[in-house]
């Protein structure tokens, strides 16, 4: 089972990453959320969004430039989808640009810059710009097109918009659909994705096909490198669920730390303190010798008797775990027969979310073990070797694995990423406990793979901030205090 791993585990980390790239099938179709992450991570790698917008608009132009049409009408929203439409209009050098909204409402720098260029070109008369609030303001255009050969470009709403169409978009879409029924010489092209129930003849999408694209979509490359799909960057952090300003206690996550023993009491405390920076409630379940050492009133404490957690504590632990969104398991647990019995029985009976770290990784019975999608493992290289993962059957690994190291490799059966934040200061004891608590906190309200990626990034970036301030001379507690700084920078 371990033959694949033994060949590379202690070699170059990138060698493992390349092997995983071969084993994990690349996605041909991605979700809008995944595309947004890739788009932002391309910027993280240094590719400006205004360049991607230029490439997207130019790709649409190249597809339509030879169409024989009397008129080109480009409906643009105030987001980056509209920005793509502005670029299309510039390359066409003619047509009517209908901005649904006001110039002051254009949301991004790159879209605003492209609109400014259009305004300058409009002074020459070939491009006409109209800002509208209501669909009725373009009735004259629809009337004019009833007997003309025309191309209508839909750059109204991109992949980031959900729910029912609001006005005036709904009525504009209805009018375009009605026009197509009257005049068969109307050709409708959507940019990236169709707006609502619009009956497009062609959709030109970018980089990869999206799950919401219809069969008429074609894919155009716009200069996003493969690395943007694999790197963990600020795009991942932006995808995390945002805290609702109207939420109340408990709605932003509840984490239970299960660990500690007579030998190690600091590990669960560090994990708990890291989690508390993000979620609403943190509980610690441990033996009395750990609980007695905790001097943090922020925690909810659950005490059991003995030197180690053991099978006699399973039923009580299961009852407590039901109150929480996620369990972080293993920090300071100790690796012996008692903890092994406890952990394997607990996992067999508990079906919630679990972050499995440290000693918990060592005492799992991996014979016939099911790598559930509810699990995130956070091993270092020796613990990873112990897990005995067979890369030839990686499709069975539904759990997310965070292989810690100079570069963190995060993967499961369907996903693979690499995190390059962090430095040698993170080799100190306790920093792994911080990471486990951090990932657990994110996992409370987000999906497993995103939580693992973001936890690794935040932990490493916090270390990078400390490296600038203190060199390598920082502690796990210093690391915890930097977590909010990282989140404020990137969210």
UniProtKB/Swiss-Prot annotation:
Co-factor requirement: K(+)
Origin superkingdom: Archaea
CDD domains: YXKO-related (cd01171)
Cofactor annotation comment: Binds 1 potassium ion per subunit.
Protein function: Bifunctional enzyme that catalyzes the epimerization of the S- and R-forms of NAD(P)HX and the dehydration of the S-form of NAD(P)HX at the expense of ADP, which is converted to AMP. This allows the repair of both epimers of NAD(P)HX, a damaged form of NAD(P)H that is a result of enzymatic or heat-dependent hydration.
Record keywords: ATP-binding, Isomerase, Lyase, Metal-binding, Multifunctional enzyme, NAD, NADP, Nucleotide-binding, Potassium
GO biological process entries: metabolite repair; nicotinamide nucleotide metabolic process
Region annotated ADP-dependent (S)-NAD(P)H-hydrate dehydratase, chain positions: 232-491
UniProt domain YjeF N-terminal: residue ranges: 35-230
Residues holding (6S)-NADPHX 1: 192
InterPro entries found in the cross-reference section: Carbohydrate_kinase_pred_CS, CARKD, Nnr, Ribokinase-like, YjeF_N_dom, YjeF_N_dom_sf
This enzyme's EC code(s): 4.2.1.136, 5.1.99.6
GO molecular-function terms, A-Z: ADP-dependent NAD(P)H-hydrate dehydratase activity; ATP binding; metal ion binding; NAD(P)HX epimerase activity
Pfam families on file: Carb_kinase (PF01256), YjeF_N (PF03853)
Sites where the protein binds ADP: 404-408, 423-432
Reactions catalysed, as given in the entry: (6S)-NADHX + ADP = AMP + phosphate + NADH + H(+); (6S)-NADPHX + ADP = AMP + phosphate + NADPH + H(+); (6R)-NADHX = (6S)-NADHX; (6R)-NADPHX = (6S)-NADPHX
Region (NAD(P)H-hydrate epimerase): 1-230
Domain YjeF C-terminal: from-to ranges: 232-490
Record flagged with keyword Nucleotide-binding: yes
Positions annotated to bind K(+): 81, 154, 195
Record-given protein name: Bifunctional NAD(P)H-hydrate repair enzyme Nnr
Family: In the N-terminal section; belongs to the NnrE/AIBP family.
The species this protein was found in: Methanocaldococcus jannaschii (strain ATCC 43067 / DSM 2661 / JAL-1 / JCM 10045 / NBRC 100440)
Record-listed (6S)-NADPHX 2 binding positions: 332, 433
Spans annotated as NADPHX 1: 80-84, 158-164
């Amino acid at each position: 089972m371990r033959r694949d791993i033994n060949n590379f585990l202690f070699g170059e980390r990138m060698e493992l990453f390349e092997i995983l790239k071969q084993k994990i099938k690349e996605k041909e179709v991605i979700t809008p959320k995944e595309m947004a992450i890739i788009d932002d991570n391309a910027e993280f790698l240094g590719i400006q969004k205004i360049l991607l917008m230029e490439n997207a608009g130019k790709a649409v132009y190249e597809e339509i430039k030879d169409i024989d049409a009397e008129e080109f009408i480009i409906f643009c929203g105030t987001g980056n989808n509209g920005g793509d439409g502005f670029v299309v209009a510039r390359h066409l050098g003619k047509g009517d640009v209908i901005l649904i909204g006001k110039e002051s409402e254009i949301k991004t720098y790159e879209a605003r810059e492209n609109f400014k260029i259009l305004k300058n070109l409009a002074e020459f008369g070939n491009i006409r710009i109209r800002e509208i609030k209501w669909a009725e303001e373009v009735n004259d255009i629809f009337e004019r097109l009833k007997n003309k050969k025309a191309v209508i470009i839909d750059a109204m709403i991109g992949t980031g918009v959900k729910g029912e169409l609001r006005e005036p978009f709904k009525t504009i879409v209805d009018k375009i659909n009605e026009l197509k029924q009257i005049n068969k010489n109307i050709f409708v092209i959507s940019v990236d994705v169709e707006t609502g129930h619009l009956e497009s003849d062609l959709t030109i999408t970018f980089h990869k096909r999206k799950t919401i694209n219809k069969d008429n979509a074609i894919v155009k490359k716009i200069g996003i490198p493969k690395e943007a799909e694999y790197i963990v960057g600020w795009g991942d952090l932006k995808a995390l669920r945002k805290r609702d300003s109207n939420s109340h206690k408990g709605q932003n996550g509840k984490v239970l730390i299960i660990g500690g023993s007579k030998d190690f009491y600091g590990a669960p405390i560090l994990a708990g303190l890291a989690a508390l920076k993000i979620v609403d409630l943190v509980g610690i379940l441990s033996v009395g010798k750990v609980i007695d050492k905790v001097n943090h009133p922020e925690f909810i404490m659950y005490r059991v008797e003995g030197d180690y957690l053991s099978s006699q504590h399973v039923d009580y632990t299961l009852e407590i775990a039901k109150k929480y969104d996620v369990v972080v398991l293993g920090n300071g647990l100790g690796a012996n027969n008692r903890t092994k019995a406890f952990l394997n029985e607990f996992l067999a009976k508990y079906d919630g979310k679990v972050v499995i770290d440290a000693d918990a990784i060592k005492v799992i019975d991996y014979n016939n073990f099911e790598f559930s999608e509810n699990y995130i493992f956070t091993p270092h290289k020796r613990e990873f070797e112990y897990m005995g993962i067979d890369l030839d059957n990686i499709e069975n690994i539904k759990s997310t694995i965070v292989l810690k190291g100079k570069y963190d490799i995060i993967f499961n059966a369907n996903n693979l990423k690499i995190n390059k934040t962090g430095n040698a200061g993170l080799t100190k004891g306790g920093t792994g406990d911080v990471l486990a608590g951090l990932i657990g906190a994110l996992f409370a309200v987000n999906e497993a793979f995103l939580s693992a990626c973001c936890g690794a990034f935040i932990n490493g970036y916090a270390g990078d901030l400390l490296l600038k301030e203190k060199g390598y001379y920082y502690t796990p507690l210093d690391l915890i205090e930097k977590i909010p700084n990282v989140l404020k920078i990137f969210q």
